[in-house]
């Protein structure tokens, strides 16, 4: 790192300077730290220079350097106390020095200094710990885009070797007598945990097998982290997607301290200490496997699309981005419709509805009713799952996060869909439906065969139905269920009408049937230029974020038109039809870049719905004739 990047390579040095320049008792230094790093990170190039834990191996990162991490809050632990400011006494000269404990897991002092636990100048503070995992189902193109934007300079290092760590501390330590210096082992009691009463102990890396990192989806990779949050933690909740900038802590002392606890635990009655030990294993895994990040700046992400500005409101740059894209939106929509029509074997009507589904999102809740959701059931799909899985690969190229769920009897009976509270470990055990907002979930019902659902299977199917209907998942807290609202785009592919509820049912009518589906769709994706796919990704991501409104005049026109429709066909037009028409009209308007309802888009919605219903009636008639 160059001198100009010392705020990245040695953020604790920056904090020390601001701490020393202020009266620690008044707390202004803490605000100054946040302001300093926030100002640095407002510059996009500076932010891109911070190494990212998502795409950088942990052993490439220097301990106590500034890192960033894009993640989902999987669990929130109980608040913990730590020594925000503590005083040491020099055993040789009796000189007293104040140190900061914020952004650290262990208290730092020089060899001849000892912490005075009874000092009146000590300040006990509180912080919150989030257990965070990489965004579940984050698509490869998103990871690649973020990686390509990174300007961080990292090289391999032996981050966990004590000798290397000691050298790093000594190189950076000359500026002030109270700077960081490594301990030489547990023989010297110079490094104390900064947590006050009830301090957490950490398990050694040699303990049993590698811990379960609690990822919601099977097969996920990437680091899990314990995020230490110091301010505003009540602004965040479970399943939020965050971008965290903070100080990386992989201190070997965290594991070394735990070895003492393991030795003590071995002398106790195992039955008495089992629950406590299990909780420590869950809350304090080895830092080499689950590093700690002490946050300085934490941002809740409005979306996880690297092609869009972080927010569409506020800056002139964002407004210009939106304006420029809207000017070419019509052409992009036409190309996307053609692309999806090919993916759906030439069915342009199904492609229209798939576009509406992809741009849908829950934008508000009225009592218990989620507004904006548009679960699509695409029936008539070729049986055996090949088509559905290939369609998922297409969707995966367009949205930031997605997951494919084969709805087999075995999966329904064996997979854990619903997160549950483990009271022994005092943690939330993840389930498959613990997903970040705006994740696309493709449920492949074409693989469903005759069989018996057990109790778990029934609960899982019920959970899927509640997710689709109410956009909520009832987490299992043993003694009660707790509702967690969600915002998941569910696409159900089926042979006949799905067993699951949906907002819209479209029967697929292929205009072609290639002899080799995999080769056909593979060629379609290969022929799509990255620049074109990026336009599709921007289109879908942007339209999810646009506001929409209906004027009083348009509302009156819709009401009058609906009354007329009921007069002409009272048997087949219901309140549900009006609701669906309004949803389709809203999404159709947004798909054309219009943020208010026009007569043209209302008529367009009516036309689409009429075509969809006619097709369903024809299919029903064909099925009856086949009986």
UniProtKB/Swiss-Prot annotation:
**What are the GO BP annotations of this UniProt entry?**
cell division; DNA-templated DNA replication; sister chromatid cohesion
Q: Where in the cell is it found?
A: Nucleus
Give one Pfam hit by family name: MCM_bind
Q: How does it assemble?
A: Interacts with the mcm complex: associates with the mcm3-7 complex which lacks mcm2, while it does not interact with the mcm complex when mcm2 is present (mcm2-7 complex).
Q: Which cysteines link up through disulfide bonds?
A: none
Family named by the database record:
Belongs to the MCMBP family.
Instruction: Quote the gene name from the UniProt entry.
Output: mcmbp
Would you tell me the Gene Ontology cellular component terms?
A: nucleus
Instruction: State its role.
Output: Associated component of the mcm complex that acts as a regulator of DNA replication. Binds to the MCM complex during late S phase and promotes the disassembly of the mcm complex from chromatin, thereby acting as a key regulator of pre-replication complex (pre-RC) unloading from replicated DNA. Can dissociate the mcm complex without addition of ATP; probably acts by destabilizing interactions of each individual subunits of the mcm complex. Required for sister chromatid cohesion.
Region spans: Disordered = 166-187
Does this UniProt record's set of keywords contain Cell cycle? Answer: yes
Task: Enumerate the UniProt keywords alphabetically.
Answer: Cell cycle, Cell division, DNA replication, Mitosis, Nucleus
Organism of derivation: Xenopus tropicalis
Query: Can you say what this protein is called?
Result: Mini-chromosome maintenance complex-binding protein
Tell me one GO molecular function of this protein.
chromatin binding
Q: Does the keyword Nucleus apply?
A: yes
């Amino acid at each position: 790192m160059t001198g100009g990047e010392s705020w990245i390579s040695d953020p604790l040095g920056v904090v020390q300077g601001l701490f020393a320049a202020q009266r620690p008792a008044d707390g202004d230094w803490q605000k100054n730290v946040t302001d300093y790093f926030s100002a640095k990170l407002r510059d996009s190039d500076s932010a891109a220079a911070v190494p990212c834990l998502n795409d950088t191996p942990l052993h490439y990162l220097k301990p106590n350097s500034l890192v960033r991490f894009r993640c989902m809050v999987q669990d929130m632990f109980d608040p913990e106390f730590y020594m925000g400011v503590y005083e040491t006494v020099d055993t040789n000269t009796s000189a007293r020095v104040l140190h900061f404990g914020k952004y650290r897991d262990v208290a730092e002092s020089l060899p001849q200094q000892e912490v005075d636990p009874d000092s009146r100048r000590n300040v006990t503070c509180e912080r919150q710990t989030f257990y965070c995992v990489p965004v579940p189902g984050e698509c490869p193109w998103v990871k690649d885009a973020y990686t390509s934007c990174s300007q961080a300079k990292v090289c391999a290092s032996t981050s966990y070797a004590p000798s290397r760590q000691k050298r790093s501390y000594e190189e950076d330590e000359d500026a002030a007598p109270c700077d960081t210096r490594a301990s030489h082992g547990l023989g010297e009691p110079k490094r104390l945990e900064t947590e006050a009463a009830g301090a957490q102990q950490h398990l050694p890396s040699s303990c049993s097998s590698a811990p379960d990192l609690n990822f919601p989806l099977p097969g996920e990779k990437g680091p899990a982290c314990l995020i230490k949050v110091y301010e505003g933690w009540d602004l965040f909740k479970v399943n939020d997607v965050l971008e965290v900038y903070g100080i990386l802590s992989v201190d070997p002392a965290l594991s070394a301290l735990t070895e003492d606890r393991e030795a003590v635990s071995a002398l106790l009655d195992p039955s008495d200490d089992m629950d406590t030990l299990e909780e420590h294993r869950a809350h304090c895994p080895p830092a080499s496997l689950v590093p700690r990040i002490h946050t300085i700046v934490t941002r809740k992400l409005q979306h996880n699309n690297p092609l869009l500005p972080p927010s569409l409101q506020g800056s002139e740059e964002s407004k210009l981005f939106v304006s420029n894209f809207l000017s070419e939106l019509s052409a992009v929509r036409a190309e996307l419709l053609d692309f999806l029509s090919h993916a759906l074997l030439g069915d342009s009507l199904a492609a229209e509805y798939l576009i509406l589904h992809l741009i849908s999102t829950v934008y508000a809740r009225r009592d218990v009713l989620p507004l904006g959701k548009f679960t699509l059931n695409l029936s008539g799909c070729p049986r055996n799952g090949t088509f559905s899985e290939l369609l998922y690969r297409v969707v995966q190229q367009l949205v930031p996060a997605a997951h494919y769920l084969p709805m087999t009897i075995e999966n329904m009976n064996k997979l854990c869909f619903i997160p549950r509270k483990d009271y022994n470990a005092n943690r939330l055990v993840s389930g498959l439906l613990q997903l970040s907002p705006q994740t696309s979930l493709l449920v492949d019902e074409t693989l469903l065969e005759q069989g018996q659902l057990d109790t778990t299977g029934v609960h899982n199917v019920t959970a899927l139905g509640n997710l689709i209907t109410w956009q909520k998942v009832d987490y299992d807290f043993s003694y009660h269920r707790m509702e967690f609202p969600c915002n998941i785009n569910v696409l159900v592919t089926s042979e006949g009408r799905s067993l699951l509820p949906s907002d819209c049912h479209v029967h697929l009518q292929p205009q072609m049937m290639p002899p080799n589906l995999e080769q056909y769709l593979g060629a379609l994706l290969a022929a799509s230029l990255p620049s074109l796919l990026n336009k599709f990704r921007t289109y879908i991501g942007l339209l999810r974020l646009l506001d929409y409104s209906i004027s009083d005049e348009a509302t009156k026109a819709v009401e009058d038109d609906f009354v007329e429709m009921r007069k002409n066909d009272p048997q087949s037009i219901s309140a549900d039809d009006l609701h669906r028409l309004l949803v389709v009209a809203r999404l159709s308007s947004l798909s054309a870049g219009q943020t208010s309802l026009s007569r043209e888009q209302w008529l367009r919605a009516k036309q689409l719905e009429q075509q969809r219903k006619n097709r369903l009636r024809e299919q029903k008639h064909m099925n009856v004739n086949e009986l």
